[in-house]
């Protein structure tokens, strides 16, 4: 990781069927994560509720993260019914403040 500040776009939402969402949604990468500045991502599932997922996408800059968040919102409005979403996912922007690996 460089010393430059990085931005993280964190998305949380419930999915009706994780495997279907992962295969037909996330893995297909319809927006093009790399082409829009995503440097890395993590997909997380809740231990208490496996249908709850969180995705963390890391960017070099806040403007890149904001632009990608808007593309996600546009896509969600189009595909929400297919994945059984009762409400659209929520996207929040964060600045990476500290990282330590052990």
Tell me what each language-model feature is:
Residues 23-26, 36, 56-58, 67-70, ...:
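Surface-exposed beta-strand edges and their flanking turn/coil or helix-capping segments
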Residues 6-14, 42-71:
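Short, well-ordered beta-strand segments in beta-rich or mixed alpha/beta enzyme
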Residues 19-21, 63-65, 99:
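Residue-level signal for secondary-structure boundary sites
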Residues 1-5, 36-54, 77-102:
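Glycine-rich beta-strand-turn "strand-cap" elements at beta-sheet edges
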């Amino acid at each position: 990781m460089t010393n430059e500040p990085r931005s993280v776009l964190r998305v949380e939402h419930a999915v009706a069927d994780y495997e279907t969402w992962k295969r037909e949604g996330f893995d297909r990468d319809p927006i093009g994560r790399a082409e829009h500045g995503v440097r890395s991502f993590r997909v997380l599932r809740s231990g208490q509720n496996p249908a709850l997922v969180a995705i963390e996408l890391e960017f070099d800059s806040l403007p890149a993260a904001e632009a990608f968040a808007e593309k996600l919102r546009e896509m969600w409005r189009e595909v929400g019914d297919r994945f059984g979403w009762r409400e659209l996912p929520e996207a929040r922007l964060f600045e990476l403040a500290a990282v330590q690996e052990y």
